[in-house]
Amino acid sequence: MAEAGKQQDFPSTIDIPLAGMHLSRGTTATLDQRYVNVLFELYTNPLTGGKSLMAVKRPGLAQFSQPPAGAATGRGLYAWAGSGKIYSVFNNKIYSNTTDLGVTLAASTGRVWFAETSPTSTERILIISDGTDNYHITTADVITQIDEVDDPQYPQNNLGPVLFYDDYIVQAQSDGEIWNTEPDNFTSWTSLNVISSAMYGDELEAIVRLKDQIMAMGKQSIEFFFNNGTSNSPFLRIDQNSLQLGLATKNSLSFAGESIMWVASTPAVGGGSRQVWLIEGSRQGKRVSTPALERILNAETITSCTAWMETIAGHLIYVLNLATSGRTWVYDVSIGMWTEWKTASDAIFPGMAATSVDGQVYVQDATNGRIYTLNPTTYQDNGSNFTVTIQTDNYDFGTPMAKFQSGLWLLGDNTTGTINVSESDDDYVTFNTARTIDMTVTHKFLAEGGMFFQRAYRFEYTQNAALRLQKFSLKLEVGVG
């Protein structure tokens, strides 16, 4: 016999995935659906073709080295196969592993940029640019500072990004001039070896290589150049490829392999709106930011951001640190989804640059002078537990009637300790006192749950252990009035 006051045609058990999209209604960090300190993994059944999306705890940080032996501002990191060493810049010093190479950079602040010549070049060197001077490092760690004293036609006050392209070193200036050295002569600059990006009236912000082309990225436009083999400047613009889409700041620009990502300024849609864009190889570029993220980007002092790209545990990720809002956003190129990363103290993720050697990712801290390893089998950040937080949308389950929850089941791998589960029935204003689910057992269950009209769920896990979750299930009944 039916229980009085309850609907009988409502599904008794409802499954809710624990992976999805951030749904922030504004710039507040704590409201709405959010996924913190996870990556998503997509699994496909080869027999049925069925797919399941799981939330997996992000990799953790462990200290690898501290080249300056104390707190210092991180400015760039690069692993060079030519010497088998990791090069870093902290404050105004260059380090080879932990050895200070004994020069003081001309520009004492801002991101530095790296390029390496080919093993078949006359001179195999690593080039570091701070936007004022270049620093050429040999495989024996002999360093030479290059500026207008060495060559009066050296492009002073350049943008910083330095490229190696077909035996040329290429740099650019904000007025749109793109300079190249003489072929296979990396200290010889002449005023004839210049071409300008001049289709639009905006200033140049950065250059980056995409396969066999150079992208000249202005603040509101992008032009493409290729090696046409002409004398002086060998580059020729591909007019039909130009885009009325700019680069909001070069600090957001990052690349790995044939993938390039950046925060774009988009005058074509009015108001200079900011979006995150991705170009992969020869494919057409695409916008990958969500409306929720774009609201945050448009409220940000974007020039203070940092960004990097690396592959970790099978995920090619773009990590965007927004200093003004104190938040770190991570885009997984493999599956096209965003998550958010935080530290144990609920602060911005500390890594401002990254590099990798033989599958091991290294991350440079923004302020403390340290270099960390980033590893999927490390479940802390430098010895401190950080919290995985999954907060769901505010569900009414398709009806305004009262709902009665009689059980909650969590589907995920067995692991260490407990996970906290709490609910909000007042649009995220308050959450009730968390109950715990034992993650060491197969049957992960909470009894009862009371009555609600709309409810959001929050799962928090702070153990020094792995975590992989797929979904949770609710047993609900609905009132009739």
What kind of feature is each model-predicted range?
Residues 2-102, 106-125, 242-260, 265-481:
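Beta-sheet repeat architectures centered on beta-propellers
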Residues 75, 160, 205, 212-213, ...:
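Beta-propeller and closely related beta-sheet repeat lectin domains
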Residues 97, 137-139, 177-185, 422-425:
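Conserved Ser/Thr-centered positions that define the repeating blades of beta-propeller domains
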Residues 98-100, 138-141, 184-185, 228-230, ...:
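Short loop/turn segments that connect beta-strands within beta-propeller blades
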Residues 116-149:
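Hydrophobic or amphipathic alpha-helical targeting/insertion segments
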Residues 139-165:
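Asp-box/WD-like beta-propeller blade repeats and closely related beta-sheet repeat scaffolds
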Residues 177-200, 231-238:
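Short, flexible helix-coil linker/hinge segments at the edges of structured domains or between repeats
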Residues 215-240:
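Surface-exposed extracellular loop regions of Gram-negative outer-membrane beta-barrel proteins
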